[in-house]
């Protein structure tokens, strides 16, 4: 996996069957490239670091929102505090969080101001209709999925909160029917998934120079791809429309051989910017991949880390010691009074003696 290779643009399907086949193969090749790359670099929200064109777009978006008579607020951040009813009050405080939120919508629409403006209005309308601001207080009946299917746990090396997703439990048919058996159950699950996302948003500062996005880790082991297609597409669409630029990096782990096929199905729902955030780890390479972004004491034990359920309730854990053993080196470790001898041969293979 190389962080320097940029994934190629998603292909545009041709109308002929031959062209469609080429399009599918291009999608599969695109997915294969993603197995080796992640080109995304998180953008700054500090005004002094923004180019003049982006500052102009931000000012134009604010001006458009200021024409709305009703207050607009997303994630608890007022976006048009100087709308017409309050325009005469020049002393009205300016919330610096508004710049962060509006820049997210602008980046999601490549700084096309009118498109970003429309996206803000649709998101605000959806949040009002969905009741997103109150969803954290709801009991949705998924206690048995907490800490298994979707949950916030720890943070990465840069302070981003980490959300883990694992849908392998739904290979059990009874579990699948209980959660996704009909439209009402699926709607309740989607509401619960939004609830988890809102927890992640609550953990962000949403301020220039602060932590303004989360990390998503998705475990594809045993994931029933066909059965979860409808739910996956709805979650992707809902999050892209209403949580723009909320994910700093998307890490897929335990990736099976058919991932390229799965990617070709979800690719039309993803922007190129979103796909540039992907990091892929096949089975057997999970811990090594996660350690690049998350310290071992914060990685769950099921993924090769040291963190167990409840470990973070009493504050941050004691940092783990990290080091690299080169070929031919001999290192002595002492773990809770037990001496461990670790040898590495010239090929880098390690042998541990207790």
Model-assigned labels for residue ranges:
Residues 2-354:
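Basic, amphipathic alpha-helical/coil surface patches used to engage anionic, phosphate-bearing ligands
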């Amino acid at each position: 996996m190389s962080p320097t290779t940029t994934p190629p643009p998603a292909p545009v399907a041709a109308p002929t069957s031959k062209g469609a086949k080429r399009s599918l193969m291009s999608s599969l090749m695109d997915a294969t490239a993603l197995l080796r790359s992640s080109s995304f670099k998180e953008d700054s929200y500090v005004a002094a670091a923004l180019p003049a064109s982006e500052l102009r777009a931000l000012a134009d978006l604010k001006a458009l929102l200021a024409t709305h008579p009703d207050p607009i607020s997303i994630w608890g951040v007022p976006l048009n505090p100087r709308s017409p009813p309050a325009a005469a009050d020049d002393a009205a405080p300016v919330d610096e969080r508004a710049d962060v939120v509006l820049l997210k919508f602008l980046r999601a629409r490549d700084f096309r101001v009118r498109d970003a403006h429309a996206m803000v209005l649709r998101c605000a309308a959806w949040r009002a209709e969905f009741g997103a601001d109150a969803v954290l207080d709801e009991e949705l009946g998924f206690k048995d999925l907490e800490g298994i299917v979707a949950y916030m746990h720890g943070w990465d090396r840069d302070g981003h909160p980490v959300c883990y997703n694992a849908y392998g439990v739904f290979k059990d048919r009874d579990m699948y029917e209980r959660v996704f058996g009909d439209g009402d159950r699926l709607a309740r699950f989607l509401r619960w998934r939004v609830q988890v996302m809102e927890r992640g948003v609550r953990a962000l500062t949403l301020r220039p120079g602060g932590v303004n996005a989360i990390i998503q880790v998705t475990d594809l082991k045993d994931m029933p791809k066909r059965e979860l297609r409808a739910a996956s597409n709805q979650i992707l669409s809902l999050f892209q429309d209403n949580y723009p630029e909320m994910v700093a990096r998307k890490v897929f782990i335990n990736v099976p051989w058919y991932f390229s096929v799965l990617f070709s199905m979800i690719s039309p729902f993803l922007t190129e910017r979103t796909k540039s955030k992907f990091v892929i780890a096949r089975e057997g390479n999970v811990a090594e991949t996660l350690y690049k972004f998350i310290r071992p004491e914060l990685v769950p034990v099921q993924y090769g880390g040291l963190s167990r359920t409840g470990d973070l309730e009493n504050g941050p854990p004691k940092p783990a010691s990290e080091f690299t053993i080169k070929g031919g080196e001999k290192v002595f470790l002492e773990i809770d009074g037990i001496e461990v001898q670790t040898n590495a041969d010239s090929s880098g293979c390690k042998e541990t003696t207790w």
